[in-house]
Amino acid sequence: MLALFRASGAENRNLRRAIKSILGFRPGNIFLYRLAFRHRSASKVTHGVRRNNERLEYLGDAVLSAVIAHYLFKKYPTQDEGFLTEMRSKIVSRASLNKVGLHMGLHKMIQLEHGHGNNGGFKSVDGDALEALIGAIFLDKGFRFTQKIILKRIVGMHMDVDELERKDWNYKSKLIDWCQ
């Protein structure tokens, strides 16, 4: 039993170091961050409840969307709602978040059920973990801290917003506009 606690303590220290290295801060409630990296395929059932990162992912998605909406509102003061919505969609898209999560090295920390390989064939595992991580930061540190981390350490270091602005995204809308 004591070995279990030591292993858990070592795992917690390693996770704390990894988060400090990637995001520049020491987490408080390490168990939130451990949960953020537990994929549904590796769910643990406690008192009849499946414990995985999906609830944190839900929360992180909402926090990320709010932070990005505010960021874009300030960055583009003369742009209309359609432009802002399209830009937010580009930034928080599954493809974009997967790319950022992979670039950040989150795949190294994700706990998957054995036999699923690096990403277990799950296409959105890195982006889902990124959203869950944002949810964990929010619960651990609050909105303002999370906002700073998102803008400085995620958007600032791993996204080129100006490049995303130039990128054609909504091909269906472009086709409809062209046909009219």
Where are these regions (language model features)?
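Double-stranded RNA-binding/processing signature
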Residues: 1-180
